[in-house]
Swiss-Prot record:
Stated name of the protein: Serine--tRNA ligase
GO BP terms in the entry: selenocysteine biosynthetic process; seryl-tRNA aminoacylation
Gene label: serS
Source domain of life: Bacteria
Function: Catalyzes the attachment of serine to tRNA(Ser). Is also able to aminoacylate tRNA(Sec) with serine, to form the misacylated tRNA L-seryl-tRNA(Sec), which will be further converted into selenocysteinyl-tRNA(Sec).
EC numbers: 6.1.1.11
Oligomer status and interactors: Homodimer. The tRNA molecule binds across the dimer.
Residues the record lists as binding ATP: R268, S269, E270, E355, I356, S357, S358
Catalysed transformations (reactions): tRNA(Ser) + L-serine + ATP = L-seryl-tRNA(Ser) + AMP + diphosphate + H(+); tRNA(Sec) + L-serine + ATP = L-seryl-tRNA(Sec) + AMP + diphosphate + H(+)
Length: 428
């Protein structure tokens, strides 16, 4: 969430920056609501002062032996008016906060200005796409030919956009997950295990609610014994529960930066992606991801973004998978992000680079919603900066390994970095 003071004092500048994201801020509506809020605030203060004054007069009138009933009636009437004013003021404030909750973050000055993914800027490439001397297959054809992938079973059990992996392919996915976690913990990240179901406060804190509820899976509660008054949702990413570890917390500045990694399944409805990547593991309702989250001092967040991105890159480099780093433009960055790098891995089966990681600096946007703060000694608490990045999307990494390491006979050479996780096996 943006700073409400900034929205009140520099609304036109905010609107101009948001316009580069393709977001049109209704400044007239905000001005009107802010004017109403101020009017009700003044009226409430005036009624409060008047009631206090009349209340003091009751004591004096009583001491003088005067009839105090008229004063009591006036105070009661003022109390009713004050209650109405407070309700009106609260309603206006709630309307303002709902609007503010739907406003995306301001892009950082270094974020390229553009309208769509076509305007994203390549920062660097690593590795060279392999040239094959045989007709290559995509990951679905490779896996189905070996009996490792069963889409029909997944549709029978659940629906489309789910997968059943078998034998070596299931083991390879597990090996990738363990390899990623080990790489991150070796680099100083603390591994955490977190809930896969979260409440509305958690999703609001990281920016998924209220704007993106259609992308989430909400749990309907039917049991009579369930007396919980909180709706729960399946997590779309580990970013949500891990970052929310620090909701309503004040952290000692000396402990910063805090770095965490977690492996979780992720669940997304993929609303709006009808007809895209319907085949295989690229776009699923349920998928595995290893996530990295950092809580840092505001002065260090852009240095942290570079470090976070390089850590995600290190996984691809160890697996010797060609990739490129893209700086997302203002029209393509996520709702909560100020700056984002996407890592795109080369997929021979598609003859294209595809996203495999997104690394973002949210500055204080999430922290303001979360009330995630830090302080030095007894100083006043300050909002921290939050960052997160995929390290990596496990299913897409599995796709990249299968397609880049395929052999003419349909076998798969195991990347050197993974062999110790598969008992030394070199060929699948």
């Amino acid at each position: 969430m943006l700073d409400s003071k900034l929205l009140r004092t520099d609304l036109e500048t905010v609107a101009a920056k948001l316009k580069t994201r393709g977001f049109v801020l209704d400044t007239a509506q905000i001005d009107e609501l802010e004017a109403k809020r101020k009017d009700w605030q003044v009226k409430t203060q005036e009624l409060q002062a008047e009631r206090n004054s009349r209340s003091k007069g009751i004591g004096k009138a009583k001491a003088a032996g005067e009839d105090i009933q008229p004063l009591l009636d006036e105070v009661a009437n003022l109390g009713d008016q004050l209650e109405e004013a407070k309700h009106a003021s609260d309603a206006i404030q709630a309307e303002i906060e709902l609007i503010y909750a739907g406003i995306p973050n301001l892009p950082h000055d270094s974020t390229p200005v553009g309208n769509s993914e076509d305007d994203n800027v390549e920062v660097r490439q690593w590795g060279t796409p392999k040239t094959f001397d045989f007709d290559i297959k995509d990951h679905v054809d490779l896996a189905e030919a070996r009996g490792w992938y069963d889409n029909d079973a997944a549709v029978k059990i659940a629906s489309s956009r789910f997968s059943v992996l078998k034998g070596p392919m299931a083991k390879l996915q597990r090996a990738l997950t363990q390899f990623m976690l080990d790489s991150h913990t070796d680099a100083g990240y603390e591994e955490v295990y977190v809930p896969f179901l979260v409440n509305q406060d958690s999703l609001h804190g990281t920016g998924q609610l209220p704007k993106f509820e259609a992308d989430l899976y909400k749990i309907d509660k039917h049991e009579e014994h369930d007396t919980s008054d909180r709706d729960l949702y399946l997590i779309p990413t580990a970013e949500v529960p891990v970052t929310n570890l620090f909701r309503d917390e004040i952290i000692d500045e000396d402990t910063l930066p805090l770095k965490f990694t977690a492996h979780t399944p992720c669940f997304r409805s993929e609303a709006g992606s009808y007809g895209r990547d319907t085949k295989g593991l690229i776009r699923q309702h349920q998928f595995e991801k290893v996530e990295m989250v950092q809580i840092v001092h505001p002065d260090q967040s852009y240095e942290a973004l570079e470090s976070l991105t390089q850590q995600a890159e290190s996984i691809l480099q160890k697996l010797e998978l060609p990739y490129r780093v893209m700086s997302l433009c203002t029209g393509d960055i996520g709702f909560s992000a100020a700056k984002t790098y996407d890592l795109e891995v080369w997929l021979p089966g598609q003859q294209a680079y595809r996203e495999i990681s997104s690394c973002s600096n949210f500055e204080d946007f999430q922290a303001r919603r979360l009330k995630a703060r830090f302080r030095k000694g007894q100083d006043k608490p300050q909002l921290a900066h939050t960052l997160n990045g995929s390290g990596l999307a496990v299913g897409r990494t599995l796709v990249a390994v299968l397609e880049n390491y395929q052999n003419a006979d349909g076998s798969i050479t195991v990347p050197t970095a993974l062999r110790s996780y598969l008992g030394g096996v070199e060929i699948l």
